[in-house]
């Protein structure tokens, strides 16, 4: 911030912009000091912090007060922030890799994302009081179970990479009879998912084996060598669509747990993972109306088959009745929670991304099943139109089956193509 002239016009009203954001004004500080029996806020610092830590001034400890320019008025601060932001180069993102541009309906933006009643309580501290929030999370859970065709979903996790690593840990807990501490993952995972899974595996002593799950000659020997689970992206990070059911069948035969990492929007068109043999489904719900936000935060999802209910991380919302016999929402299976299970818990008060799960649920309600399918159809139709145009231009599109991500073989010209796209604003 630059130096600002004091607000002499009196246009900000009785409570200036600075006091709303900086904190207590001088009169407040004086009152606080008198109430607790000190002469000034500086005395609190001198009494609490060792003299060796404070700045020395002529042999005596003193508190150095930073020198700041006068506080800016709201309009001035906004203008300066706009000026700073104008230095950014705004382009259209085509990279994908788990983050996709989406439209947030204005009714959701106004009434949820910009509504402090929703965004201040980012997780239900006293959940049963927040019946409206629990109702929206119930809708979110139903959305996930409907699209994945699995029995139960939690009310969100922190992000897709976290959900994938939590799925790995769930598989290790659930496959107790499997003596092999090996976990198989597809070679074509999103980078952030691979990094988090590998990091979590290293900390917990799990051996992660990367193999091409689309090639039986690659994955079959690894499964036969023993594993407690597998993580199969559907579609994978290259955009390729494939059927993981053969891999899932093989892993089940050795006692392992199967995890499908799915694009939620694509599941409005594709066969659900529950019908392909997945025990667990994970992924991101960012495409359901949540802005990219420079990479996050985004609500992840996890759903599981029957029998894994007590292994799933994240909060579970159920429907019960109150003292008068009326329907009421409450958290269910709380024996998994930290306040009961302590260090053995699979869930705690922050194992969620509630606000953005609410946004995703509202997005699904706003568009309805037909609207979601129409959006997915538009996305994949445009991707196939682009692929056809690229083939007509002489480029080699690597995969015939895809949802919305296209891989192009450029025969050594990738850098030139990248530069031309960047010059064009992409």
PLM features: what roles do these ranges have?
Residues 8-15, 82, 100-101, 375, ...:
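Flexible, glycine-rich loop/tail regions that form catalytic "lids" or insertion modules at the edges
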């Amino acid at each position: 911030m630059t130096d600002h002239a004091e607000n002499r016009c009196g246009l900000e009203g009785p409570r200036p912009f600075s006091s709303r954001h900086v904190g207590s004004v001088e009169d407040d500080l004086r009152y606080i000091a008198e109430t607790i029996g000190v002469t000034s806020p500086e005395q609190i610092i001198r009494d609490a912090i060792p003299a060796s830590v404070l700045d020395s001034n002529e042999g005596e400890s003193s508190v150095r007060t930073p020198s700041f320019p006068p506080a800016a008025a709201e309009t001035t601060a906004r203008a300066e922030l706009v000026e700073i932001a104008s230095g950014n180069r705004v382009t259209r993102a085509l990279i994908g890799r788990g983050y996709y541009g989406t439209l947030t309906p204005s009714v959701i933006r106004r009434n949820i994302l910009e509504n402090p009643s929703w965004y201040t309580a980012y997780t239900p501290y006293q959940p049963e009081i927040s019946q409206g929030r629990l109702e929206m999370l119930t809708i979110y859970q139903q959305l996930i179970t409907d699209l994945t065709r699995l029995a139960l979903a939690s009310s969100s996790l922190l992000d897709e990479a976290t959900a994938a690593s939590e799925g790995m840990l769930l598989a290790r807990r659930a496959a107790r009879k499997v003596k092999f501490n090996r976990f198989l993952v597809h070679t074509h995972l999103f980078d952030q998912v691979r990094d988090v899974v590998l990091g979590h595996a290293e900390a917990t002593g799990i051996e992660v084996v990367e193999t091409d799950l689309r090639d039986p000659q690659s994955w079959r020997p690894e499964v036969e060598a023993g594993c407690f689970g597998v993580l199969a992206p559907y579609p994978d990070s290259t955009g390729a669509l494939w059927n993981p059911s053969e891999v899932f069948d093989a892993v089940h035969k050795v006692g392992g747990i199967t995890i499908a990492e799915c694009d939620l929007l694509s599941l409005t068109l594709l066969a659900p993972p529950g019908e392909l043999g997945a025990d667990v489904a994970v992924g991101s719900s960012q495409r359901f109306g949540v802005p990219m936000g420079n990479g996050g935060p985004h609500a992840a999802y996890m759903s599981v088959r029957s029998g894994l209910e007590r292994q799933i991380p994240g909060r579970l919302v159920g429907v019960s009745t109150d003292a008068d016999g009326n329907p009421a929402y409450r958290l269910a299976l709380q024996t998994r929670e930290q306040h009961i299970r302590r260090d053995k818990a699979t869930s705690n008060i922050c194992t969620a991304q509630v606000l953005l799960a609410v946004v995703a649920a509202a997005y699904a309600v706003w568009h309805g099943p037909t609207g979601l399918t129409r959006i997915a159809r538009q996305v994949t139709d445009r991707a196939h139109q682009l692929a056809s145009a690229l083939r007509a231009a002489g480029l080699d599109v690597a995969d015939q089956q895809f949802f919305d991500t296209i891989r192009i073989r450029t025969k050594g010209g990738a850098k030139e193509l990248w530069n031309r796209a960047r010059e064009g604003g992409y």
